[in-house]
């Protein structure tokens, strides 16, 4: 097959796939040879060859065979001078063939030459959320190490650990800390070039650079930053070309002693389909886990949010126990917890009511159902009996000795706090007791927590053991 014949086929492909697809994926193909039923093309990158093979190979094979060429499959090879190959203005053979065939087609223009500053305008950092600062980040035992490491990096001093990798589940504060670092660096070290973006944005911009043949500009941009921050790095798992470019960018920045900060939803070694060399690089710095929030941290987050809402809802009253109730019932996701509080304040302001337990349970019924604890009454009974070194039958049974009655009341209180069971249901699980007995026991423990330090400590120890 001649270059002129391939040029004619290109015009047919242009009409079939459209201008954008043709310019991006078909026009860069260079026909080289037809050998033993295999049509060989050169491409700028492996990524482009793989994409064309997966998405356009059937169409190209059809057009080749329809034109009388016996082609069984396509082969793509990366050009020797790629990726620095200059953009071509137009394919002379294709233009000549089109003219000879008198086929009028839209002009296929080459990507325009741009300077680095123009590309930089198109690769701006992701916007930072003004709410996500260190001042608004509530610190507790589950996140204190991550917070301390983020603080150290945000000082902009000598690079002591590279990269810093923050990982943890959804809604635990990874993105908050990433934004806080960026904000702090902008204030303390405004001369530094800080680039924050998600791994998804990194991939899309990499693909854009491939399409527009600006890989050298792309490499220069990402290698010229002083601090590179990539959120949700697990997104590039399984994307070989993006991982390769990320790996080379990573190495180049580390070699220049530039700071890299990464976040992920799990430890680097546990990210499936992430290349071993990328995992190894991520693990060579400081890897910090943001643990699931405990009760104290959740309560602190709620108290901080309430203070913020006071400016918007100055007249709203929130009853005692509501924040504690929410901190106990919504334990898996801080975003859900904050969203529940936002909904609660908005609803109360619209209906003009105090935020009490009744309104809370009505307004957040769906959230509370979704966050319902898996802790059972039986589990609480066993844990309390073990803690006080008494038999399970003594907690459930009719004995009224103080050594049994107080643990029984503690168990009832924990059942009320940690399960969705009603008072009558709890009473039935405690030897068929009346709901008023349960109510009395719960109230008694609430009173003793304020006056008896040992009871307060017992309840908290048991709560932590049950929530662990």
UniProtKB/Swiss-Prot annotation:
Signal peptide: none annotated. It is found in: Cytoplasm. One of its GO terms (molecular function) is lipid binding. It holds the Pfam family DnaA_N. GO terms for biological process: DNA replication initiation; regulation of DNA replication. Residues 349-468 are annotated as: Domain IV, binds dsDNA. ATP binds at residues 171, 173-175. Residues 1-90 are annotated as: Domain I, interacts with DnaA modulators. It comes from the Bacteria. Its main location: cytoplasm. One of its GO terms (cellular component) is cytoplasm. Residues 127-348 are annotated as: Domain III, AAA+ region. SUPFAM superfamilies: P-loop containing nucleoside triphosphate hydrolases, TrpR-like. InterPro entries: AAA+_ATPase, Chromosome_initiator_DnaA, Chromosome_initiator_DnaA-like, Chromosome_initiator_DnaA_CS, DnaA_C, DnaA_dom, DnaA_N_dom, DnaA_N_sf. Keywords: ATP-binding, Cytoplasm, DNA replication, DNA-binding, Lipid-binding, Nucleotide-binding. Belongs to the DnaA family. PANTHER family: CHROMOSOMAL REPLICATION INITIATOR PROTEIN DNAA. Plays an essential role in the initiation and regulation of chromosomal replication. ATP-DnaA binds to the origin of replication (oriC) to initiate formation of the DNA replication initiation complex once per cell cycle. Binds the DnaA box (a 9 base pair repeat at the origin) and separates the double-stranded (ds)DNA. Forms a right-handed helical filament on oriC DNA; dsDNA binds to the exterior of the filament while single-stranded (ss)DNA is stabiized in the filament's interior. This is Chromosomal replication initiator protein DnaA. It comes from Ruegeria pomeroyi (strain ATCC 700808 / DSM 15171 / DSS-3). The gene is dnaA.
């Amino acid at each position: 097959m001649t270059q002129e014949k391939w040029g004619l086929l290109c015009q047919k492909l242009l009409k079939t796939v459209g201008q954008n697809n043709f310019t991006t994926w078909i026009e860069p193909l260079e026909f080289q040879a037809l050998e033993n039923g295999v049509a060989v093309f050169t491409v700028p990158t492996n990524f482009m060859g793989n994409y064309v093979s997966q998405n356009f190979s059937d169409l190209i094979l059809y057009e080749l065979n329809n034109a009388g060429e016996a082609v069984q499959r396509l082969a793509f090879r990366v050009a020797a001078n790629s990726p620095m190959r200059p953009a071509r203005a137009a394919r002379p053979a294709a233009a000549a063939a089109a003219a000879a065939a008198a086929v009028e087609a839209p002009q296929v223009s080459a990507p325009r030459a741009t300077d680095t500053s123009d590309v930089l305008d198109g690769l701006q950092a992701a916007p930072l959320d003004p709410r996500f600062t260190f001042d608004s980040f509530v610190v507790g035992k589950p996140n204190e190490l991550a917070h301390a490491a983020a603080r150290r990096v945000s000082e902009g001093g000598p690079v002591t650990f590279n990269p810093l990798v923050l990982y943890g589940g959804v809604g635990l504060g990874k993105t908050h800390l990433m934004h806080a670092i960026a904000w702090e660096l902008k204030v303390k070290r405004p001369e530094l070039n800080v680039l924050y973006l998600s791994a998804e944005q990194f991939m899309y911009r990499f693909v854009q650079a491939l399409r527009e043949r600006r890989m050298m500009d792309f490499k220069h941009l990402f290698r010229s930053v002083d601090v590179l921050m990539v959120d949700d790095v697990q997104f590039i798992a399984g994307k070989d070309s993006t991982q390769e470019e990320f790996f080379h960018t990573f190495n180049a920045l580390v070699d220049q002693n530039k700071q890299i900060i990464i976040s992920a939803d799990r430890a680097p070694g546990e990210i499936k389909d992430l290349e071993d060399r990328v995992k190894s690089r991520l693990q060579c710095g400081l890897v910090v886990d943001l643990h699931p929030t405990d009760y104290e941290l959740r309560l602190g987050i709620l108290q901080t949010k309430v203070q913020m809402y006071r400016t918007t809802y100055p007249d709203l009253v929130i009853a005692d126990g509501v924040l504690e109730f929410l901190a106990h019932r919504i334990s898996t996701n801080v975003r859900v917890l904050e969203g529940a509080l936002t909904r609660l304040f908005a609803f109360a302001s619209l209906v003009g009511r105090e935020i009490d337990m009744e309104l809370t349970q009505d307004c957040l019924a769906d959230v509370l159902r979704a966050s319902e604890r898996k802790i059972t009454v039986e589990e609480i009974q066993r844990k309390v009996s073990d803690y006080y070194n008494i038999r399970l039958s003594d907690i459930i049974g009719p004995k009224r000795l103080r050594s049994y009655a107080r643990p029984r009341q503690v168990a009832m209180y924990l059942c009320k706090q940690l399960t969705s069971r009603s008072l009558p249901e709890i009473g039935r699980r405690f030897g068929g007791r009346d709901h008023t007995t349960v109510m009395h026991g719960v109230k008694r423990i609430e009173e003793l927590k304020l006056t008896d330090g040992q009871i307060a400590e017992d309840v908290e120890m048991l709560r932590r053991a049950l929530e662990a």
